[in-house]
Structures are given as structure tokens and as C-alpha cells.
Amino acid sequence: MLLKKGDNNENVKLMQQKLGIEPAVTNFGPKTEAAVKEWQAKNGLTPDGIVGPSTWAKIMGESAAAPTPIVSAPIAPVGGLKLDKLKGHIPDAVIAMIPDTAAKFQINTPLRLAHFLAQCGHESGGFRVTQENLNYSAKGLAGIFKKYFPTEAAATPYARQPQKIANKVYANRMANGSEASGDGYKFRGRGYIQLTGRDNYTQFGKAIGEDIASNPDAVSSNYALLSAAWFWSKNGLNKLADGGAGDTVVTSITKRVNGGTIGLPDRIKHFKEYYHLLA
């Protein structure tokens, strides 16, 4: 959920009703923005006038981990696209987040959106997983993290201990502290494109006006898609996506997202599926 000045939908009206703004309309104008800022300041939130998942959840009296936005019909277009074409292929809750997220980070053409969703879908196991699974066996560690565990014997003390594994493999990089600091596990991969490392969490927080480094779980619970879009934009992936619909473009994007080409056939398959729907 992301609402800001200029938006016009039923979610805006519902929010206005909760805040006591009269008359409640569907337009998010200056009056609504001022009311949101005032409410945020009174409730210990960043008074930026933007209604993200945390603000929405507090206004609605819900758990911040499970915001339940209203999805108006028809779904808002992005770059001239009707996102309801994606129904049945992507969870409705994800589709509902696309308009504002895509507009914020210019993922607003058939190519860009299809490439973006293909990567998100693969990295998250079909939009089901929002945080990194580090429950590896010794054999798995020696295969995936060979730099840190050159042999199964070296990996055995860490096997099936996700916290120890993360603290080991993510220590002393990405602005994380030492293995003993616990930063590796605290800032492990979250979101649909696995935001990882203190530096990325801090930068993402600045981009949305929240202290995400102090509440990293918000990435998986509230900002799975938005964090992925921020990563996408930060790494210049719109420009790569503009290169076309060929497998070589998917490969180039995959290397930047994954650091390699793990799962490339699945990413290509999903890209073709989404592009066919959106083009």
C-alpha cells in the first residue's frame, strides 16, 4: 500500500473517513496531505504525508505486518497497461501494489514491468517467499558458499543454523559489522528481490522516509515489492529492460539481480508469460 498526493481511488476515500476528513472523496489533495502529516506526527511516524504500509496499518487499526488494502476495479493502468491482465498469474495482493510502486520507480512499460515481475517472481518462489532461507546442510553450504566453507568439514559447525550462517557469509561487507555483530542475520535477504546488507537497508529507508535499518523486518512484511523496485531502479535495470524481449536481455538482468544465472530458464519463462499478457 502506497498513497500520496495526486492519487485518486477508493483507498484514499477510506483513509479520509478514518481520519475524519469531511467530505470524504477519492482524491488525495493538499488538504488530505496536511491531515496525514499531522496524524503521522502525533502517532510517532515520519510526517512525510505519504501513506505507506506502516501508516496505513495504524490508521486502519491493523497489524503493520498484514495491511489489507481495498483493491478498486478496474485496476489502475501503468504506462497504458491494464494490470487486470495479470490476474490469475500473480497474486491479487501483489497486483494491488503495482500501480504506485511502478509509478514511483518508472517501471511503466510492458518490457520493464514484465522483466521486473519475472525477476521478482523467480526470486520469491512465485511471490510466496519474502525472506531468505538460510537453512543449509553442510553439503549445501560447501556448494553455495564455497568461499566461506571450502569443505563440508568446515561447514559442519554452521549446518542448519541460519543465524550463524548469515552472520558468517555477510560479515564485514555491505556496511555490515563483524560476524559477532549479528548484522549478517539482521540484514539478511528480504523482499521479492532479497534486499541484503545494512547499506541497502539504510539507503532504501532514506528513499521512502522510514528508518528501515532499525526495523528490517518491515521489508518482508510491508515493503516486499517496493524494496524490489528500489533495488531495480538503483541498479539501472530499467535501462537494461528497455533492451528488448530477447533471452540475452533476461540474462543480463539476471546477472545483475542474482550475481549469476541461477534459475535463468524459469526467469525467461516467466518473462515471456508476463510480456505476452502486457504487450
Where are the predicted features?
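Acidic helix/loop microenvironments that form the catalytic cleft of cell-wall polysaccharide enzymes
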Residues: 30-43, 120-124, 241-263
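Peptidoglycan-targeting cell-wall enzymes and recognition modules
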Residues: 77-90, 121-231
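Extracellular/periplasmic catalytic domains that process cell-envelope and extracellular macromolecules
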Residues: 108-112, 185-188, 223-224, 247-250
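Active-site-adjacent structural elements in enzyme catalytic domains
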Residues: 110-125
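Short acidic, glycine/serine/threonine-rich helix-capping segments at coil-helix boundaries
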Residues: 2-62
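An amphipathic alpha-helical core segment
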Residues: 208-262
